[in-house]
Amino acid sequence: MLHIYHGDGKGKTTAALGLVMRELGHAQKVLVVQFLKDGKSGEISFLKQQPLVTCLYSPMPKLFYYQMGQEMRVTTALSQHALFETAEQTAAQYACILLDEALDALQLGILQEIEMLAFLNANKAREIILTGRNPSKNILACGDYITCLLYTSDAADEEDS
């Protein structure tokens, strides 16, 4: 089953981690791959302590992708794509695979839609979770459960006023 959490609202990763928790509650092995994140979140710190979870991420510069120079973008894209390749190679070991921010990696051209569609097709027996913004029509067409989280307000907006 393919779960897609997308949109400009907060909570996509949090919702995805709820599915991860459900799988862990059923003693299932889970792979969590974080694209464009450095793995330093509290959630990843917790998940790394769980014996049934494998977490993959790559060090990230303290810049958004669009702020990086060409050389840094190439290096970052290669390291992020290597995460996807590892997920492809090890997918059979897991009941559930979270590809966090994969939709953003697709939008930025770090991952190619054709390879993602092949991955999704090859892993229909698994719970696959994609998060991020702006999924393509082809990706959405593969989804079994699709949730769009919309931005309405943020406490930080109040603080900035």
Model regions and ranges:
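Short loop/helix-cap segments at secondary-structure boundaries that form the rim of catalytic
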Residues: 48, 137-142
